Amino acid sequence: ALRFIKKLADRGAAATVLGNHDLTLIAGARGLKEIKEKDRTQDVIDAVDGDDLIDWLRKQPLCLFPNEQTILTHAGVPCIWDAQKTAALAKEVEAVLAHDDLSVLDAFLAEMYGSKPDLWTDDLTGNERLRCITNYLTRMRLTNAEGALEFSFKDTLDAPMPEGYLPWFEFPSKAAQTHQIFFGHWAALEGRTISEHIQNVDGGCVWGKNLIAYRLEDQQAFSVSNPVM
């Protein structure tokens, strides 16, 4: 799948954003994350063109603007960031991931994993700052009203949630005031959100559910069931 998306992107027919599993693949390929069977990444690393694929992958964005009214990230945009701030902070991490000096990349990957800090402040610095940005854009599901992250919950919207925390998209969003937000990551949602300006396009396809597509031109959603599982 990665090779196919790269071919499409090379022709200008596709674009992608990085998610938590992509970062795990990159870290594993650099020898900075233990590769587990459930990650299903070893075949990519061992492929004849594996190095080229991973080098291409690490140079992809965390945040993409398909048009002037739309933001795409893997996990979403926290309520405390507007569109401009989201783009600027994403670029900070993207610059490190795509750095020509691989020691700069490795230094970040070695410190990328962790759930602290769990609340954004503008005075964060170094790898803590980069980790916090990465967690918001690739791991976020629940936050509190101040934007603090909660990582343990992965269930459906109907399940009980930790006190004080809600799905990030249930809080008034600065970015959604000016842009439509698209995200994946949270397969248990199966495409459900409560906001017309925030769309989930992870239908749980890898778990045997649906593959979701959304046509921006006319705001039309399409869903196809997984015929394999």
PLM regions with names:
Residues A87-M229:
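Acidic, His/Gly-rich catalytic cores of divalent-metal-dependent hydrolytic chemistry
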Residues A1-R3, K7-G126:
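Active-site neighborhood of divalent metal-dependent phosphoester bond hydrolases
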